[in-house]
């Protein structure tokens, strides 16, 4: 096992209540099997409640408190990375999804991003632009992480790639609003 990612909703149920103890348990596992960088091998995917769910003051308070705790832990390198899934943002991007299709769509989207990066990092090529060590370095950099995939329509222009990348970072399905100037790592595969 190279990495453990704990997935939890932060609205105040069992996910929010168990996420930090599960992070600690996963770190103990890596220490037990002899890994010295346990905190760098455990990450968290935290999903924010929708606006409708946050109509409950209890849910809104629980989510705020848990995300504050997770962000502090990620910033102090207690685990890496913290990936925040903004369910309300996804709901707005896919307004016609039924309740039954909503959660599988979110889950497939996030797991699909990991799948793409796993495939790209392990693809044989004469030109190695993103190898497993690069992927590992990005995953081990502390703090919050955003991921995205985009096509480049105007790849022959001087700014086509940078415009596509900028657009993707601004419209990622994951949570947004991060100051990218404070990023400690980045990876791009064209």
Predicted regions located by residue number:
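Tubulin/FtsZ superfamily GTPase core signature
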Residues: 1-190
